[in-house]
């Protein structure tokens, strides 16, 4: 078993460049966490705002398939560059939209372009880092994400109380910065697509991979829960009488906890078989969100954030490394694209269904979160032939 210091030293320089660029991009994720609040402020209903967030999820779904294919075909770096510059342009266009149809269309396009990089980034980490160091590498990758996430929403919350336009400008600017970093400092990564490969071959291989299918189903369940953070959780905080900055600080608490504790937790979880750790994390996430319905004070809301964040810290680095482990090298980008597709479906299903239920029976949202958390844990622990 390698020590934590050994694992850190084993990571190559390009991996650290990827982590740094990811931090910059994640810090600038200003708009999507506040999209529900922005749209309701300019006059749209909660249901309409939830549908717009679902459109972002549809774009995410398109990006999951296209991003995985592009990562294997044109290289990891080129896919990241395309994603960053394209998303900056679409985000600036979205900032100027006021009619509902253009907002939904541009949100979908922004979702596709801004999420196109994810399969490529995960695949590039898998290319650069050997299996024995991947859990640590993905832990640091998530640390970069959550360092940005700790500072970004808190900054965005204060900006949003003055001008939502600043959120769009900041989001686009950080994407452009990461685009240039990727263009000049990242390696191409593997190109594993071959012209002789039959159409849909990677999908057929994945469909016969029972452990991978169980993992995909569990991922879909828990991501439907996770995406309540930017939709019904925001509405619940506002319904409890708190301003946007309180929601921003609660979201940033998630990132700060991960920054402080996840790498230490990762060094513990990597000692065990991945499936029980993923199941435990998914269960804690479901329970944490389920308790939100009972939380109407800031301390109680903070407690729920701590519980589901603990679940995220236990499961997420292990889950990503597990997906890379299951993926054959020649299909790595597309396997990870399928994982991202489950995240996309969770975003498509979660916010619209959650906001619709919230308007009619808020308690049903939090009960469903608990049930989905239990289901996802059970899928990960299911015996496989």
Segments (PLM) and residue ranges:
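Residue-level signature of mid-helix packing/kink "hotspots" within the transmembrane helices
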Residues: 30, 57-65, 149-150, 255-259, ...
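Helix-loop junctions on the cytosolic side of multi-pass membrane transporters
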Residues: 127, 182-196, 382-385
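Structural signature of the two symmetry-related core transmembrane helices
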Residues: 78-92, 276-290
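Helix-loop junctions at membrane interfaces in 12-TM secondary transporters
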Residues: 95-106, 293-304
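Juxtamembrane intracellular "pre-TM" segments in multi-pass secondary transporters
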Residues: 1-12, 187-217
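Helix-to-loop junctions at the C-terminal end of transmembrane segments
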Residues: 63-75, 261-274, 358
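Cytoplasmic helix-loop-helix junction between adjacent transmembrane helices
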Residues: 107-145
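Helix-loop boundary and gating motifs at the non-cytosolic
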Residues: 8-57, 213-218, 222-250
């Amino acid at each position: 078993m390698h020590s934590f210091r050994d694992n850190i030293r084993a990571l190559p320089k390009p991996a650290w460049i990827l982590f740094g660029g990811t931090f910059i991009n994640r810090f600038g994720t200003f708009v999507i966490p506040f999209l529900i609040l922005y749209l309701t402020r300019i006059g749209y209903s909660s249901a309409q705002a939830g549908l717009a967030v679902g459109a972002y999820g549809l774009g995410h779904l398109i990006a999951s398939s296209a991003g995985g294919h592009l990562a294997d075909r044109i290289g990891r770096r080129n896919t990241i560059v395309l994603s960053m510059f394209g998303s900056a342009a679409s985000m600036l266009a979205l900032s100027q939209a006021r009619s509902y149809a253009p907002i939904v269309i541009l949100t979908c396009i922004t979702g596709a372009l801004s999420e196109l990089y994810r399969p490529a980034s995960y695949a590039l980490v898998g290319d650069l880092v050997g299996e024995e160091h991947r859990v640590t590498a993905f832990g640091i990758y998530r640390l970069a994400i959550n360092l940005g996430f700790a500072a970004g929403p808190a900054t965005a919350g204060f900006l949003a109380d003055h001008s939502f336009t600043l959120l769009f400008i900041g989001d686009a600017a950080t994407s452009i910065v990461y685009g240039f970093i990727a263009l000049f400092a990242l390696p191409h990564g593997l190109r594993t697509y071959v012209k002789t490969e039959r159409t849909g071959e990677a999908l057929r291989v994945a469909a016969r991979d029972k452990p991978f299918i169980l993992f995909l189903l569990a991922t879909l369940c828990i991501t439907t829960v996770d995406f309540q953070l930017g939709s019904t959780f925001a509405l619940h905080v506002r319904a409890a009488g708190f301003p946007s900055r309180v929601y921003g600080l609660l979201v940033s608490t998630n990132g700060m906890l991960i920054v402080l504790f996840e790498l230490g937790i990762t060094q513990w979880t990597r000692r065990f078989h991945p499936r029980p750790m993923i199941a435990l994390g998914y269960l804690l996430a479901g329970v944490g969100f389920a308790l939100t319905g009972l939380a109407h004070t800031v301390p109680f809301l903070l407690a729920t954030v701590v519980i589901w964040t603990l679940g995220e810290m236990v499961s997420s680095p292990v889950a990503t490394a597990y997906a890379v482990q299951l993926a054959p090298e020649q299909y790595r980008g597309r396997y990870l694209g399928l994982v991202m597709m489950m995240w996309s479906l969770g975003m498509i299903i979660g916010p619209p269904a959650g906001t619709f239920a919230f308007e009619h029976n808020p308690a049903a949202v939090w009960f469903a979160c608990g049930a989905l958390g239990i289901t996802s844990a059970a899928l990960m622990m299911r015996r496989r032939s």
